[in-house]
Amino acid sequence: IPLCLVGSEMCIRDSPDIWSAARSIVRDNGDRSSGVDLPSLSHARITSVTEGGIGERACVDLTERLLEGEGIVAGSTSSCLSLIHGETIPSQYVPTRPFRINAGAIHSYVIMGDGTTKYLSELESGDRVSVFSVDGSIREATIGRLKIERRPLLKISFESGEFTGNVMVQQAETVRLISSDSKPISATDISQDDEIIVVIDNSMRH
């Protein structure tokens, strides 16, 4: 329903600046840097990109929109997770779905709002996950729906110092990780020696 100011021709529905400001307020209010102790962002080097066969991948649909540069962290090991970007970027194949993160294979770990981890397969409507931003802020968001389908996968392996990890994601250009210069990069364009943003913490618990 469009909301208009009395005596004004301006409708909130038609003002992207107002929506942007509103989302910024939500993000700032949700920043829990002084609350739950969560790991910070690091960089990792891609060591290999290989086919991962056919498997079940999970799209996590939130009850609110993501901003560019935001996503959730996921991976095959809880100590080394990669930042998966939300579907906020236009594509010639599908429309944007700014509430969605195509987070990868169902065995992957994700960080919840309370700092614990769950497998993607365990997530349910109403669960709270941690949303990470390239600017270092972290907020919570509620899951509205989980969409699991069989798709071809890519296994993207990486290392950061003594830590190694991998993430298995759908082989699709709309699935994006985030490069070390804070720009989204399609999973189908990632190559060996590229650098991506990850979260590293060997104290993660499940």
Regions from the PLM with identified roles:
Residues 111, 129-131, 197:
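Hydrophobic beta-strand signal
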Residues 18-37:
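C-terminal helical cap(s) of enzyme catalytic domains, especially alpha/beta-barrels
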Residues 1, 116-119, 186:
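Short, conserved secondary-structure segments in the cores of folded domains
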Residues 34-96, 131, 135-163:
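Extended boundary segments
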Residues 104, 120-124, 189-191:
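Short, well-ordered loop/turn sites that connect or cap secondary structure elements
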Residues 1-7, 11-12:
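Single conserved hydrophobic/aromatic residue that forms the stacking wall/gate
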Residues 133-138, 198-206:
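Short, charged beta-turn/beta-strand-edge "cap" motif at the junction between a beta-strand
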Residues 147, 155-204:
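Glycine- and charge-enriched low-complexity intrinsically disordered segments
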